[in-house]
Amino acid sequence: MPTYSPKAGDVTRQWYVIDATDVVLGRLAVQAANLLRGKNKPTYAPHVDGGDFVIIINAEKVAISGNKRQDKLIHHHSGHPGGLKSRTVGQVLETRPERLVEKAVKGMIPKNKLGNAIAGKLKVYAGPNHPHAAQQPVPFEIKQVAQ
């Protein structure tokens, strides 16, 4: 009997919703990245997009451990000379909390075409509401919360 190799058409996808309230950002990102890649499934293969859809709600209430809220800087560049912009994690969390969570999760998936397809299945919302009720997402609980 030959070894089973999953194909793109063999995948059945499920929708998960994760509440980010009082969950440490890194632990949230690890769990979300594993669900997106399909590492929780017995048919996991690194060359196939076999993961599930992940909805993260309450991104504004995510926990940041240590002094990272005021000490850690997030950089981006406009592309023009002298166009390096820097903001602290706390500033980003106040203005666009969904971007902070997206950046943390996308940093844990591959940086290639497959990674872009995987990142497309991530939906992040700052508040408790999301427009994906028709997909009947299953709640996914992260047991380790911040003290």
UniProtKB/Swiss-Prot annotation:
Describe its function.
This protein is one of the early assembly proteins of the 50S ribosomal subunit, although it is not seen to bind rRNA by itself. It is important during the early stages of 50S assembly.
Keyword Lipid metabolism annotated: no
**Complex and partners:** Part of the 50S ribosomal subunit.
Q: What is this protein called?
A: Large ribosomal subunit protein uL13
Q: Which gene encodes it?
A: rplM
What is the top-level taxon of the source organism?
Bacteria
Gene Ontology MF term list? mRNA binding; structural constituent of ribosome
Q: Which UniProt keywords apply?
A: Ribonucleoprotein, Ribosomal protein
